């Protein structure tokens, strides 16, 4: 078994590339951010603070789908409202510790491509391969804006840009597990190369 850690800020393209990479390698893809979104969704729907239900909630991840207490919530967690709430919840140490342990358990059962913001630094510091994807904030905001429009959501580019800058600040400055490039991680600027070139670079690194 082996593990691939992919970190980077919101909108850097890590989810897209992680899915493609896992498919090419025929191993499990794990979107850790989706787990935080699932916690955020449950908190929103129940009105209960995460610390009061975190040890009782069931989160499963298989076939690229996220299940919350047995329900497929893959689509319900992909909104800007849930994204913002997940960012706030991710600062909670108890929530982070719970999900990190769950993510590590997954990696011990099978080979994984795991993506998030603290995979190479906290979740899987001994990962066999580490990558850090990034792009200019305006490039990432444009991607996020286009995603929202494609899903039929109302969005204004300037507001998306402001929200993304806030998200970056929160991710990079939180006390627990801030977003940083892991030691030994290969840096890739996803604004400068195509998706195919990014995938090839990762595959060449892993396959030698």
What are these regions (language model features)?
Residues 15:
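Walker A/P-loop
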Residues 23-81:
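N-terminal phosphate/diphosphate-binding loop that engages ATP/GTP or pyrophosphate donors
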Residues 4-6:
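Hydrophobic anchor at the beta1->P-loop junction of P-loop NTPases
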Residues 11-12:
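ATP-binding Walker
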Residues 83-86, 90, 94-151:
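ATP-dependent NMP and nucleoside kinases share a basic, alpha-helical "lid"
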Residues 60-64, 103-109, 117, 122, ...:
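Small-molecule kinase domains that catalyze NTP-dependent phosphoryl transfer to phosphate-bearing small molecules
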Residues 130-133, 137-139, 144-147, 187, ...:
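Glycine-rich phosphate-binding loops of nucleotide-dependent enzymes
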């Amino acid at each position: 078994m082996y593990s691939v850690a992919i970190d980077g800020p919101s909108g850097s393209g890590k989810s897209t590339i992680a899915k493609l990479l896992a498919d090419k390698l025929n191993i499990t893809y794990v979107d850790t951010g989706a787990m935080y979104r699932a916690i955020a969704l449950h908190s929103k729907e129940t009105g209960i603070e995460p610390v009061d239900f975190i040890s009782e909630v069931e989160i499963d991840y298989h076939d690229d789908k996220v299940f919350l207490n047995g329900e497929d919530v893959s689509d319900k967690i992909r909104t800007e409202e849930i994204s913002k709430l997940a960012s706030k919840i991710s600062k909670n140490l108890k929530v982070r510790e719970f999900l990190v342990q769950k993510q590590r358990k997954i990696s011990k059962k099978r080979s994984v491509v795991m993506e998030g913001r603290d995979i190479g630094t906290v979740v899987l510091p001994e990962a066999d391969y580490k990558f850090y994807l990034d792009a200019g904030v305006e490039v990432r905001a444009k991607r996020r804006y286009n995603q929202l429009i494609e899903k039929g959501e109302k969005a204004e580019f300037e507001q998306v840009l402001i929200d993304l800058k806030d998200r970056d600040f929160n991710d990079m400055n939180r006390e627990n597990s801030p977003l940083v490039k892991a030691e030994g991680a290969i840096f890739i600027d996803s604004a400068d190369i195509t998706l195919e070139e990014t995938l090839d670079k990762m595959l060449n690194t892993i396959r030698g």
